[in-house]
C-alpha cells in the first residue's frame, strides 16, 4: 500500500521505506510512504476466499447482498437527519469504553463477507496488529480498539436498530451515489436517486467543503464519531477521521468523492489508509487473549477519554 506524505526523509517513525516519486506532469514532486511494516496482509479471508469479494459464492454471499439491497434503499437524507437528531442527544446510557466493548460480544456483522466472529474479536485483532507495527502510536492502537463500538446501536438499550442502519460500507447522502459503491444497482430504488436536489455530483454540497460537512449514511461509524467528539476525546483529528470514515470504501479504495475533501481531510487520509490495512486484513480465526491485553487498553482509554462516556 502506498500513501502520499508531505515530509521528506528516508524513513518514518515505524521504519517504513519512503520513496520519492516524480509525477512528471509539472506538479510538485510528491513523496510516497511505502508501508513496509511487519504485518503482512493474507491472501484470503477466514472462509478461504478473497477479501471483500461480494460476488464470490459463499454461505454468506446472498445474505450480504440482501443486506445491501435494504441498506441502499433506506439510507436517505431524511433518514440520516432523523437518526443524527435522535442519537446526538447521547441520552441512552453512561458507560466506559471497555463496558461497550463487552456489549459487542453478542453481535456478528451481517454485512461482512470476511468474518463471522463476535465483534470484540475483530476490535482486538485490529488493535494488536497495529500495536505490533506502530508501537509508539498509542492513539492509533486505541482507535483500532474503538472504531467499531458504534455497533452497540444493535443492542436493545440503544434502540436495536436493524443491521442495515448500523453496519456496512458508508457513503454520502445528498449527492449522487457513486458507481464504485458495492451493489450500486439497488440505489435505483432509493427515494433520493431521482431527486434533482440530491442526484448531481455535488448535490447539496460544494467543492472542497470538507467531509465534516457531509452527511454520511447512518451507522456505527457516524455514531461513534459523535460519541467520541461530544465526550471531549483527546484523540488527534486523524483518530476521529478514521472512526467516521473507515467504512467509506468508495473514498479510500476507489477515490470517489475526493472533490468534497479539504486539506485537513487529505492529511488525515494518510492515516486512514494505514489503518485500513489492519481493519480489513487482520480478520482471522486467531483469538486474542483478552485478559492479557486488557490492562494496556484500559490505560489508553483513561488517557484519551473520561472514565464514563455518554452514549
From Swiss-Prot:
Bilayer-crossing regions: none
Chemical reaction(s) catalysed: myo-inositol + O2 = D-glucuronate + H2O + H(+)
Binding-site residues, substrate: 52, 109-111, 151, 168-169, 246-247
Cofactor dependency: Fe cation
Enzyme Commission (EC) number: 1.13.99.1
GO biological process, one term: inositol catabolic process
Binding site for Fe cation 2: 148, 220, 246
Known role: Catalyzes the oxygenative cleavage of myo-inositol to D-glucuronate. Involved in the biosynthesis of UDP-glucuronic acid (UDP-GlcA), providing nucleotide sugars for cell-wall polymers. May be also involved in plant ascorbate biosynthesis.
Binding site for Fe cation 1: 122, 147-148, 279
GO cellular component: cytoplasm
Protein family membership: Belongs to the myo-inositol oxygenase family.
Domain of life: Eukaryota
Summary of the knockout phenotype: Incorporation of the inositol pathway-derived monosaccharides is strongly reduced in knockout AtMIOX1 seedling walls.
Cofactor descriptive note: Binds 2 iron ions per subunit.
Biased composition, class Basic and acidic residues, residue ranges: 1-11
Disordered: annotated span: 1-29
Pathway field: Polyol metabolism; myo-inositol degradation into D-glucuronate; D-glucuronate from myo-inositol: step 1/1
EC class name: oxidoreductase
Name of the featured protein: Inositol oxygenase 1
Tissue: Expressed in roots, young leaves, stems, flowers and siliques.
Entry's localization field: Cytoplasm
Protein keywords: Ascorbate biosynthesis, Cytoplasm, Iron, Metal-binding, Oxidoreductase
A molecular function (GO) term: iron ion binding
Amino acid at each position: 500500500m502506498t500513501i502520499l506524505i508531505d515530509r521528506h526523509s528516508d524513513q518514518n517513525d515505524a521504519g517504513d521505506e519512503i520513496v520519492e516519486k516524480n509525477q512528471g506532469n509539472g506538479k510538485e514532486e510528491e513523496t510516497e510512504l511505502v508501508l513496509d511494516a511487519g504485518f503482512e496482509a493474507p491472501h484470503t479471508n477466514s472462509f478461504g476466499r478473497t477479501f471483500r469479494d461480494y460476488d464470490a459464492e459463499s454461505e454468506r454471499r446472498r445474505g450480504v447482498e440482501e443486506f445491501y439491497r435494504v441498506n441502499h434503499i433506506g439510507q436517505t437524507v431524511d433518514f440520516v437527519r432523523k437518526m443524527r437528531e435522535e442519537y446526538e442527544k447521547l441520552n441512552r446510557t453512561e458507560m466506559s469504553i471497555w463496558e461497550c466493548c463487552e456489549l459487542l460480544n453478542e453481535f456478528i456483522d451481517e454485512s461482512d463477507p470476511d468474518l463471522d466472529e463476535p465483534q470484540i474479536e475483530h476490535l482486538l485483532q485490529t488493535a494488536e496488529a497495529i500495536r505490533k507495527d506502530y508501537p509508539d502510536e498509542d492513539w492509533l492502537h486505541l482507535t483500532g480498539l474503538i472504531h467499531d463500538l458504534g455497533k452497540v446501536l444493535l443492542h436493545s438499550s440503544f434502540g436495536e436498530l436493524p443491521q442495515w442502519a448500523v453496519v456496512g460500507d458508508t457513503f454520502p447522502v445528498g449527492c449522487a451515489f457513486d458507481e464504485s459503491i458495492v451493489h450500486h444497482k439497488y440505489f435505483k430504488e432509493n427515494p433520493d436517486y431521482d431527486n434533482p436536489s440530491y442526484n448531481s455530483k455535488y448535490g447539496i454540497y460544494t467543492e472542497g467543503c470538507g467531509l465534516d460537512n457531509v452527511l454520511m449514511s447512518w451507522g456505527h461509524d457516524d455514531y461513534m464519531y459523535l460519541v467520541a467528539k461530544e465526550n471531549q476525546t483527546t484523540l488527534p483529528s486523524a483518530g476521529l477521521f478514521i472512526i467516521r470514515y473507515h467504512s467509506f470504501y468508495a473514498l479510500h479504495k476507489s477515490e470517489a468523492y475526493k472533490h468534497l475533501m479539504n486539506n485537513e481531510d487529505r492529511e488525515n487520509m494518510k492515516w486512514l489508509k494505514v489503518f485500513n490495512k489492519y481493519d480489513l486484513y487482520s480478520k482471522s480465526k486467531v483469538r486474542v487473549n483478552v485478559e492479557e491485553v486488557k490492562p494496556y487498553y484500559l490505560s489508553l482509554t483513561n488517557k484519551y477519554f473520561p472514565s464514563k462516556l455518554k452514549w
